[in-house]
Design a protein with these regions (language model features):
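ATP-binding N-terminal substructure of ATP-dependent carboxylate-amine bond-forming enzymes
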Residues: 1-95, 100, 105
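Active-site nucleotide/adenylate-binding loops and adjacent lid/helix of ATP-dependent enzymes
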Residues: 4-5, 100-144
Length: 144
């Protein structure tokens, strides 16, 4: 079987490396991959970052399933897109990925469900955009 691992970090390299050790796996593609995955003969980097083009690649190459590592393609809806096209993919939906990709969403979720978390404020006013430059005791600015 052929597998696609989406990402370029160490986590994706480790996943691809381990998957390639299975006798059932004939090829592991890594998109976009990194220098380490490029040197591993059991792995093949794929220079595609557009999600629709990646789905086309999966269909064309008869990839059995895709594993998505990084937050950016998850937040971009890769899982939703692949599922809509009938492709097998491991990862959270765009909506579920908001727990990691959006601090504002995650904080509101925790507050709504009574999950203990630090106090927070969310600002959308451009006049308050400088808040990320302020540093004082007890204040930890984060982008939403």
């Amino acid at each position: 079987m052929k597998i696609l691992v989406v990402g370029s970090g160490g986590r994706e390299h480790a996943l691809a490396w381990k998957l390639a050790q299975s006798e059932r796996v004939q090829m592991v593609f890594v998109a976009p991959g990194n220098g380490g995955t490029a040197r591993d003969q059991r792995l093949q980097n794929v220079a595609i970052t557009d999600l629709n083009e990646l789905a086309d690649f999966v269909i064309r190459e008869h990839v059995a399933f895709t594993v998505v590592g990084p937050e950016i393609p998850l937040a971009g809806g890769i899982v939703n897109l692949f599922r809509a096209r009938g492709l097998k993919v491991f990862g959270p939906s765009k909506e579920a990925a908001q727990l990691e990709s959006s601090k504002d969403f995650a904080k509101a979720f925790m507050k709504r469900h009574g999950i203990p978390t630090a106090e927070y404020e969310t600002f959308s006013d451009a006049a308050l955009a400088h808040a990320d430059q302020l540093v004082f005791e007890g204040f930890a600015p984060k982008s939403a």
